[in-house]
Amino acid sequence: MSRAFQLFQLAPQFDVDEEQLSRQYRALAAQFHPDRFAAASAFEQKQAVMMTAALNQAYECLSHPLNRAAELLQMQGIDADAPEHTRFPPEFLMQQMQWREALMDAQAAHDEAAMARLDEEIAREQQQLYGQLRGYFAAEQYEQAAQAVRQGRFLDKMRQEIRKAAGG
């Protein structure tokens, strides 16, 4: 089992109870916060710092759907970020070009409303992709899940570019 799932005592699956994850994170972070070990030995202080770092990393992994999917794939021996998973279907490549063109047009026109609409469109695509990932994991279609993770990474990056272009 993945260390991230183990730390939070969660079953390794794509869908997680995000409220439970957040509650457990806060409880564990409070339990192992380095300030609680200020009077402890140097070894115990170092252990607390290391545990806090591990908790933060595990929480980052499990709180983001694509990172969680990549972790599940890693458990199957599949690196979702490997080059063989970068071949996208032609339709997705065309959609990427259309989104980039729409972003450039919106930037050139300083059209924040157009950027917001583009961001909303891509957010809807992300939600559809998360639904596909659920299906791929349920059917144990790990190669398709890896492709979907790569597509999702593009969507994340595109939304970051939109926010940057919009000034936020």
List PLM regions with ranges.
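C-terminal accessory/regulatory regions appended to core domains
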Residues: 1-168
